[in-house]
Amino acid sequence: LGEYINSMDRTNQALRELKATNLRTNQQAISDLSNLLSVGTQNLEEVFRDMCHRDAQPIEPLGFVMKGSDFPRLPSQKTAQLRTIHSQMYNFTSQGSKVDLGPSAKAYAQERGQYITLSLQNLAAASLSTARKVGGADAVYRQGSNGIGTYANGIQGMYIAEYDNICPIFSREEWGQVLYATCQSSLSAFASTLKDLDSHIKNNFITDCYLAYEILEVVTNMSFQIENRTGELKLAISDALKPIRETAKSSLSQLLTDLRTRLQQTHQLPFDGAAVPITSEVMQRLQLMTAYLSPISSIMRSLGDGGWSAPNTSNSNASIPTLKSFDVGADGKQLFAHYSTDTIETLMSNLESRSRALLKGKSLQGVFIANNIAVVERMIRSSDLASLLSTAAQPKLDAWKKKASQLYTDTWRDCSQILLDVQYTSKTP
């Protein structure tokens, strides 16, 4: 290889000298040497491609992820050889027109890009298969039950390993371009997988909206780690995540809308004033959301306080999350508390409206409201909601308890006034 490159160097030097003479009689020699140099460059490209191909057999990333092991890198001896070939090809092709990627960079991106895509395809398939409903259509998504976390870890490990391969072979100004070209195919497959997951979430919105929050957190953390090590790919990953991010943003208002619709379509309430199942369902939803405070806080910050009532997604292109936006902090907890109290207020106000229409007598309506408030309070106290809602929700809960008490005692008001009427008479002299 060294002798071949030296021969090409001599040919290249001769070509430069002939071009410098600018004599018409040298044009045939210049043409012959240019063709010879072109053939030599093509041969070097084939050698470069073949060397990349030898170490591009697909691997199974799951084993590396489960063991926490580093993903394989190219041997240092091979990267040195590849760098030598690339440097020569870059010098030869630089005499022609400038292109975004040289022949060797394109060959590297094709061979290594295919290796990454094929290696990750099983993790992509697992992410889709684990999203399928197992416990019935009403089964609520359980945190960590989808394979997206393993898929993201596989992408992160392989991209960082590939960046470590690229740096010794190519010049610094080429690192970003070569990395993007190498990862482009697997990024497209990743974006396609996220679109399929987004469709699944939309089809099972009430039970699987939590999967959108999990994907948002997992993929954003992956993006931060890759950017921290490579300085690249953040925008590309953010574009792939966009459908999930928009679905997660719209979920907050859609859940409230679904709650109103379900309650307004209720045509029967317990005749004894017992609490209705939807109250427990709503509180369980809020309990589950506490496990996703980080991504939900990021969503709420982008919407603004109260923005879930009338979300504006027209500026979604500007909502690329930052590391700071995923820090829950005091304001994140406060936003979640406001959303939770809005949810509880929506629940209770619609329950009161339906009780007036479906239950006879204010006392029964009062019992109904009191029983539902009792469920709300109990489920707050018995979960992580206690620390988040103790200050924000209690005044509103107290107001509803007072209203329930007033409704219950309203029937007895006239009677109690008569029974408790006291007349004082003065003693006779």
What are these regions (language model features)?
Residues 1-429:
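Long alpha-helical rod scaffolds of large eukaryotic non-enzymatic complex subunits
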